[in-house]
Amino acid sequence: MKIKLANPRGFCAGVDRAIEIVNRALDVFGAPIYVRHEVVHNRFVVEGLRTRGAVFVDELDEVPDGALVIFSAHGVSQEVRQEADARGLKVFDATCPLVTKVHMEVMRYSRDGRECILIGHAGHPEVEGTMGQYDSANGGAIYLVEDEEDVGRLIVNDPGNLAYVTQTTLSVDDTARVIDALRQTFPEIKGPRKDDICYATQNRQDAVKELAATCDVVLVVGSVNSSNSNRLRELAERMQTPAYLIDGAHEIQPDWFAGAASVGVTAGASAPEVLVQQVVQRLRELGGEAPAEIAGREENIVFSMPKELRIPAVNQS
């Protein structure tokens, strides 16, 4: 059985930065460090940080006075920021800069009194944070839609003064259909100059399409609460290729590969490469050949760290 590895796969720049912020905060300030929500949606990563002394909480009222808190990569609402400020908490913001870009768009629409539609999944932390950037005091409102059916049911106050933004980890194809529905329903709607779906989401979806087209089975390494990982599994399944979302090699079932000549492996943007390599090792134990990397789009984006957590340059003499 051939093993093919998607490229790119796994960690994106925003996830790398968020995890590094927690690790460096632990190095500099010591445990405990409080993190609002899972810093990224991956069980292996979260458990590793918890072992080092990170304490994951749902809300700020679980954070003691005077403690240090980190906001997750998914971002937080203005209300959460204001609560942290009011309590005098020391904050490091691990919000992905590409999520922050969407936040800035929403705040601009809010200031201008333009109504805004967010395309996203209800209940996802990124969606809650983005919705929470909109201040309706200027007379506008923000609405959430997930699919074309939601668009058909949507009633807005001012169709002539309307814009849309999107969650960064959506299915590219699904989102395009929702945007088409929005444009048909609200012909004057404005959109971002550049798509809000992030480069890593796009690249990983392109790569899994290639896997699904050439493999009999696809494995997606990622946790069940990871939006972008779920989209990868769904995309492979839509191409009529059996696909499984797994947290690690221990979840692999040998009967998935009955009659399969090839298996493709990819990983969501919050899944570390060590898990991919463990999956490959398990597949080889089940008779898989040495893995082959599929050519893909190179990624070299790096996001900067907060100043207090940057490693000082070594003096050259």
From Swiss-Prot:
CDD domains: lytB_ispH. Its EC number is 1.17.7.4. The active site is at residue 126. The keyword 4Fe-4S applies. The keyword Oxidoreductase applies. [4Fe-4S] cluster binds at residues 12, 96, 198. Pathway: Isoprenoid biosynthesis; dimethylallyl diphosphate biosynthesis; dimethylallyl diphosphate from (2E)-4-hydroxy-3-methylbutenyl diphosphate: step 1/1; Isoprenoid biosynthesis; isopentenyl diphosphate biosynthesis via DXP pathway; isopentenyl diphosphate from 1-deoxy-D-xylulose 5-phosphate: step 6/6. Dimethylallyl diphosphate binds at residues 41, 74, 124, 226-228, 270. One of its GO terms (molecular function) is 4-hydroxy-3-methylbut-2-enyl diphosphate reductase activity. (2E)-4-hydroxy-3-methylbut-2-enyl diphosphate binds at residues 41, 74, 124, 168, 226-228, 270. It is an enzyme of class 1 (oxidoreductase). Keywords: 4Fe-4S, Iron, Iron-sulfur, Isoprene biosynthesis, Metal-binding, Oxidoreductase. It catalyses: isopentenyl diphosphate + 2 oxidized [2Fe-2S]-[ferredoxin] + H2O = (2E)-4-hydroxy-3-methylbut-2-enyl diphosphate + 2 reduced [2Fe-2S]-[ferredoxin] + 2 H(+); dimethylallyl diphosphate + 2 oxidized [2Fe-2S]-[ferredoxin] + H2O = (2E)-4-hydroxy-3-methylbut-2-enyl diphosphate + 2 reduced [2Fe-2S]-[ferredoxin] + 2 H(+). This is 4-hydroxy-3-methylbut-2-enyl diphosphate reductase. It comes from Hahella chejuensis (strain KCTC 2396). The lineage of its organism: Bacteria, Pseudomonadati, Pseudomonadota, Gammaproteobacteria, Oceanospirillales. The gene is ispH.
